């Protein structure tokens, strides 16, 4: 998710677990081009990272084809609202799926397990894990770090988890 652009770099938000332990990074764009990237910062607890790509390395065609994402507010999402998940499902290239918001403010514990909580209670301080937006949009391996968009095209979340089992 391109969140910033200066004369010298593109700033891209992704998940921390995507870049964790990487010695080198390569960012692939929708036009098929790929460029070396460096980690600018991260928050392991929130599973967020920002990487940068030097604009001097990026072709003019690629620069012309990209834009900085519009950031929305996940607080404004409503249960039942439609969302779009963008990613690179299974590493096959850009993918887009749609779904609805099933719940908000889901919590995970340190092992990544979903903790039971009241999905409408924003004030809970008992669960200190990451807040999650639950959606039925297909999120597959490779979608991590991709954008979750509202129907106005604004980023309201970053795809990061797939619950593989309900047991």
Protein language model features and the residues they cover:
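Serine-dependent protease modules
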Residues: 1-167
């Amino acid at each position: 998710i391109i969140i910033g652009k200066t004369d010298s770099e593109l700033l891209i938000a992704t998940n921390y677990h995507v870049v964790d332990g990487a010695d080198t990074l390569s960012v692939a764009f929708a036009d098929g081009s790929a460029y070396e990237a460096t980690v600018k910062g991260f928050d392991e607890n929130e599973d967020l990272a920002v990487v940068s790509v030097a604009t001097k390395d990026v072709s003019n065609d690629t620069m012309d084809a990209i834009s900085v994402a519009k950031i929305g507010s996940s607080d404004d999402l409503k249960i039942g609202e439609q969302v779009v998940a963008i990613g690179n499902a299974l590493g096959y290239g850009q993918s887009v799926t749609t779904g609805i918001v099933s719940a908000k403010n889901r919590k995970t514990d340190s092992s990544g397990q979903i903790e039971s909580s009241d999905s409408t209670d924003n004030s809970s301080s008992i669960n200190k894990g990451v807040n999650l937006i639950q959606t039925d949009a297909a999120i597959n391996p490779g979608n991590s770090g991709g954008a979750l968009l509202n129907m106005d095209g604004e980023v309201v979340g970053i795809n990061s988890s797939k619950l593989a089992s309900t047991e």
